[in-house]
Amino acid sequence: MSLPYFLADDPASGVLTGAEAKHAHVKRIEPGEHIMLIDGRGSAALTRVTSVTPSRVDGVVEKQTRVPQPSPRVTVVQAVPKGERAELAVDLAVQGGADAIVPWISHRTISRWPANKQAKQVEKWRAQALSSAKQARRAWVPEVREPVTTNQLSALLRGAKDERRGDERHALVLHEDATASIRDVDFASLGEDIWLIVGPEGGIGDDELEVLGAHPVKLGPEVLRTASAAFAGLCAIGALTARW
């Protein structure tokens, strides 16, 4: 059975404080047990627990590890789903291996985030990403970025393309009407940074596809829910590249 993961400011210290210490206490972690401390940026420390309180956990670090980031790096652009499906989308994307997640307020997005509530929603996504990363035993916790509109996303994609050599389309958009299969993508030409775009429940409009300039691909004949599409796409990319 894999060890439980906890986020620590400094895994090498063998110390947990704050919410993570409370979490360990609630999980009834006891002295003598082993846990894995991570910093969310690839550093991990196998730790034998020596004491547990609701506010602090102390332990002895037995082994330190540096986990390399998967390559190629995949950023998921997730159109914001409505209700509880939003957190499900984040959960599945993290389980699938997303390296970063960008909330997207597309033209057809049903769930709109008012300006005065955006910060709270982003924090919910970040909390979910951390929880899911620990559950998935990941040393890297995906970054959840600030939400973007379609025009802002287009600018992000152009900026990412400008940093690369060549003019390959490095962004893939999952689309039910695409004629190309994801298995036919020449991933070697996309470089070390791939953007995977998932549309809303109402679908991505033709005008948005044109603005984004992304490469439409399909996973198969089935139409997936927006909350599960990124997971399926990430699994396909994992199998078709060196990520897995």
Short names for language-model regions:
Residues V74, R169-L172, E192-V198:
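Generic beta-sheet signal
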Residues D206-W244:
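Structured adenosyl-cofactor binding patch, chiefly the S-adenosyl-L-methionine
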Residues V144, A171-V173, A214-K218:
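Conserved beta-strand scaffold positions in the cores of enzyme catalytic domains, especially
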Residues M1-R66:
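N-terminal positively charged helical leader segments and presequences
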Residues R66-H170:
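RNA substrate-binding interface of SAM-dependent RNA methyltransferases
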Residues D186, L190-E210:
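A C-terminal functional module that forms or caps the active site or interfaces directly
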